[in-house]
């Protein structure tokens, strides 16, 4: 084998390893550090392949976490987006995140799902704020007192991880008004 072939083959292998390392989302971490109304410590990658750990990496003082469990629930998530985008404009200390929550799975499956979502979501803000969690869903649901996966769950969380408000299901004016009242009360 010529030296040139060895160099080219080595470059291809190293390039492939780097590419896989760059796009493969790691398994999420889950730690329940406090009982009561606190968001557990979780890690995941957004659709721009950046790793986050929450609550440490919450960007603002008040963070709305929207948790869907099934792909079809994206339609329910979408009912909230216009309202939470308006709330974000009205209250600079507020931001929202989507955290699709999926069972732990092999690396190729995680890559396939994340890259599929990435391809289907061209909006840069949505990519930045969609952090997929691959973890033990039973422990996650137990920590957040989520009884089932039949609907989406929303949590208003401060930087310390304290849950200030929670709701279930599609947007309604009543739920949004309640959220705004809580935001006003803690500001």
Feature locations, PLM:
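Short active-site neighborhood of thiol/selenol oxidoreductases, capturing the structured segment around
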Residues: 54-79, 96
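Loop/turn elements at helix/coil->beta-strand transitions in domains of secreted/extracellular proteins
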Residues: 60-62, 92-95, 151, 159-160
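N-terminal "domain-start" segment that seeds a small globular fold
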Residues: 27-54, 79
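Solvent-exposed loop/turn segments at secondary-structure junctions
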Residues: 71-73, 102-106, 137-139, 162-163, ...
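Short, internal strand/loop/helix patches
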Residues: 97-99, 111-149
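Thiol-/selenol-based redox modules, centered on thioredoxin-like
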Residues: 141-143, 149-187
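N-terminal targeting signals for export/organelle localization
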Residues: 1-38
């Amino acid at each position: 084998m010529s030296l040139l072939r060895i160099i080219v083959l080595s470059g291809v292998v190293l390039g492939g390893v780097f590419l896989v390392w760059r796009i493969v989302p790691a398994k999420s971490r889950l730690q329940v550090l406090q009982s009561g109304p606190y968001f557990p410590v979780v890690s995941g990658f957004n659709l721009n392949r950046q790793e986050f750990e929450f609550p440490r990496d919450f960007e603002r003082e008040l963070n709305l976490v929207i948790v869907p469990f099934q792909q079809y629930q994206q339609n329910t998530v979408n009912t909230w987006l216009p309202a939470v985008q308006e709330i974000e404009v009205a209250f600079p200390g507020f931001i929202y995140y989507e955290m699709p929550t999926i069972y732990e799975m092999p690396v190729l499956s995680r890559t396939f799902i994340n890259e599929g979502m990435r391809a289907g979501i061209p909006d840069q803000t949505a990519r930045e704020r969609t952090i997929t969690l691959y973890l033990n869903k039973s422990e996650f649901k137990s920590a957040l007192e989520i009884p089932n996966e039949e609907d989406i769950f929303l949590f208003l969380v401060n930087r310390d991880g304290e849950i200030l408000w929670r709701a279930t299901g599609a947007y309604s004016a009543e739920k949004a008004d309640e959220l705004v009242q809580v935001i006003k009360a803690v500001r």
